[in-house]
């Protein structure tokens, strides 16, 4: 069982992600913004982070760069899960350190795998 942090401001999407991952045997914690995510990340490190790009308080790419800059978090796998679907967006995500890039809408089987 993995601990997965979901950073997503759309409650419907975060609930789908969380429900699907919990059904696959994982533990999840949902965060609607960067501020609440940083607070928890300082306390406990997850096995995986699912990160949206368009968040209310801070761009997901900025959050990703901060994750990669810190010694204690730089090795945590991060998957961008976003509505930004262009090739340029995907390249930006991967160039900034994302381990993978999924676009919305996504399939539950794709998410769980």
Question: What is the predicted function of each stretch?
Answer:
Residues 106-113:
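C-terminal output helix
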Residues 10-29:
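Two-component/phosphorelay signaling modules centered on CheY-like receiver
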Residues 14, 56, 86, 104:
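The feature encodes the CheY-like receiver
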Residues 25-34, 40-41:
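Short hydrophobic/Thr-rich beta-strand motif most characteristic of the beta2 strand and flanking loop
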Residues 45-47, 72-77:
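His-Asp phosphorelay/catalytic-motif detector in bacterial-type signaling
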Residues 52, 82:
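Active-site residues of response regulator receiver
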